From Swiss-Prot:
GO cellular component: chloroplast
GO molecular function: rRNA binding; translation initiation factor activity
Organism this protein belongs to: Nicotiana tabacum
Coiled-coil features, chain-numbered ranges: none
Protein name, entry field: Putative translation initiation factor IF-1, chloroplastic
Chief location of this protein within or outside the cell: plastid
Length: 96
């Protein structure tokens, strides 16, 4: 827990989660590239693994709910419930 925000919200630091693409996305030939915002389901048995279930439309970084900065990787996410997260990963220009 990093800090408390208004309206009962909290800023929480999470570990990076290893994800795989769900069968529907793979079957539909939807391309997921670095920088895309996606919705994931986190496994109830292992919180370090998840599944990408939906690719969201990209928005401006200012519209994000939370913004954590980790060296070389920026992570933004919005908590929907305990099993689903909206997850966005952006590779910093230093890595390109």
């Amino acid at each position: 827990l990093l800090n408390r925000l208004p309206n009962g919200l909290f800023r929480v630091c999470l570990d990076l989660i290893i994800n795989y693409v769900s069968g529907k996305i793979r079957h539909s030939f939807i391309r997921i590239l670095p920088g895309d915002r996606v919705k994931i389901e986190v496994s109830p048995y292992d919180s370090t693994k998840g599944r990408i279930i939906y690719r969201l439309h990209n928005k401006d970084l200012k519209d994000s709910f939370f913004n954590f900065t980790i060296p070389f990787v920026g992570i933004q996410f919005e908590m929907k419930n305990f099993k689903k997260l909206i997850f966005f990963q952006e590779i910093d220009s230093e890595l390109r």
